[in-house]
Structure formats: C-alpha cells, structure tokens
Curated annotation (Swiss-Prot):
GO terms for cellular component: cytoplasm. It holds the Pfam family ATE_N. It comes from Pseudomonas putida (strain GB-1). Belongs to the R-transferase family. Bpt subfamily. Its EC number is 2.3.2.29. Keywords: Acyltransferase, Cytoplasm, Transferase. GO terms for molecular function: arginyl-tRNA--protein transferase activity; leucyl-tRNA--protein transferase activity. One of its GO terms (biological process) is ubiquitin-dependent protein catabolic process via the N-end rule pathway. It is found in: Cytoplasm. The gene is bpt. It comes from the Bacteria. This is Aspartate/glutamate leucyltransferase. It catalyses: N-terminal L-glutamyl-[protein] + L-leucyl-tRNA(Leu) = N-terminal L-leucyl-L-glutamyl-[protein] + tRNA(Leu) + H(+); N-terminal L-aspartyl-[protein] + L-leucyl-tRNA(Leu) = N-terminal L-leucyl-L-aspartyl-[protein] + tRNA(Leu) + H(+).
Length: 235
C-alpha cells in the first residue's frame, strides 16, 4: 500500500445528486495538486474511488450511502446464458487499443450516444470541450479500446489499466445497434482482457439499488460490493 495517510482530500459543498434527484450529495476529491500516480490510484480504487477527467473522487454524503462501489472478480466470473449470447452476437467485432486523443470519429459517436441514451442527464448536451475534459486525458494508464465492425467504429471503452485491475471509466457506443447490447459486451470484453493480463478485477464504479440505470451491474456474477469498508461477494 502507498502511504495514503499523507494524502490530502477535499470535500465539496452539498450539491444536487446526479443519480437520485431528491437527494443532496457531497463528493470527496483527492487534492488535485497530488500527481496522478498509478499506485495511489490503485490503492484508492480499493477504497471506492473513481476517476473523472484529472480527478479522483468518491461519494462522501452525510445522510446517504446509496452509492456502493462494485467490481467483478475476473477469475471467478461465469457468464450466464444471455451474456454468452451477447458474446456470440459480437464475435465479428475487432478490438484495438489506442492512446487517448480527440478524434471527430470518437466525438460523433459520443454525441449520438449521449443525445439518444442520456438526453435527460447532466452530460447533455454533449460538446467537444466536455468530451475532451472528461475523457481525453494524457495519462499513461488510460486507454481507448476501439470496437470496430469492418472498420466502422461501433463502441469505445475508456479504461484505466491499474496494477490491480481494469477500471471502466466510460463506454459509449452506436445507439442504433440495440440488438448487439454493446454496453454489456464491452464489460464482458473487459473481463476477458483483465483475465488475459492477469488482473484481479474490473471496477465498474457505483451501483445504486434504486437507480434503474445501474441495474445492469449486478447482472455480472459474482460481483463484489464495498460495504462497511469490506469487499463483499454477491453470488
């Protein structure tokens, strides 16, 4: 473990919760003057922290603990029947790793995805600046995994490659290809990639029981949830 006790953190003032509309949220951030060290990041991921842009954060709400960090233990994951069908359905896709960069091809896919799937969220309307600030960061552990069908870009999974696992930062994909379930396939691929690289887990971010958009995360079993500072397995 790195010397986490020496790190500085800052809590925000209460603000509107992005997931539960009737709640106020407080967020704890790692001091932005602290260099984005991959080992610090890995240790903090074990404690439920996530990355957004250049910042590491986790919920720090006084009266709510609905945001539960979730990860998939790669070596113990067993795909169910539906997930096996998704893998078969997308066997014609090729995946390549690229360094983070702004490309019109990326942004156009991201724009269509946000406008179609998340027009009710705080990421709408999408812009080039927003896309770059959120995802295009010059970090040595960040990768854009491109999913293509005969050269056509179908999805991009933005992932952080950590010593203890893959952290799924964000995935955007072709919104008109519903039958392929590209978002679910991207997670299945990341589990396979974690196994290939002998990594422990795929970190999915936060699961919220009363948020329908989060329900998909518990479809991957077993899954581990960080409860009372312990990773608890849900089979």
């Amino acid at each position: 473990m790195t010397e986490l006790a020496r790190l500085k953190f800052y809590a925000t003032q209460p603000h509107s919760c992005s997931y539960l509309p009737d709640e106020q949220a407080t967020t704890l951030f790692l001091d932005p003057s602290q260099p984005m060290d991959v080992n610090v990041y890995a240790d903090l991921s074990e404690m439920g922290f996530r990355r957004s842009g250049d910042h590491l954060y986790r919920p720090h709400c006084q009266n709510c603990n609905a945001c539960v960090p979730a990860r998939i233990p790669a070596a113990r994951f067993i795909p169910n029947r539906q997930q096996r069908r998704i893998l078969k359905r997308n066997a014609d896709l090729t995946v390549t790793a690229a360094r983070p960069a702004f490309k019109e091809e990326y942004f156009e896919l991201y724009r269509r995805y946000i406008e179609t799937r998340h027009a009710d969220g705080d990421m709408y309307p999408p812009s080039r600046d927003q896309f770059s600030t959120f995802l295009v960061r010059d970090l040595p552990f960040c990768w854009f995994y491109e999913f293509r069908l005969e050269g056509h870009l179908m999805a991009v999974a933005v992932c952080d490659l950590l010593p203890n696992g893959l952290s799924a930062v964000y995935t955007f994909y072709e919104p008109d290809e519903e039958r392929r379930s590209l978002g679910r396939f991207a997670i299945l691929w990341q589990i396979t990639e974690a196994l290939r690289q002998d990594l422990e887990a795929v970190y999915l971010g936060y699961w919220i029981k009363n948020c329908k958009k989060m329900n998909y995360k518990t479809q991957y079993r077993p899954i581990e949830l960080l409860i009372n500072q312990r990773w608890v397995t849900l089979n």
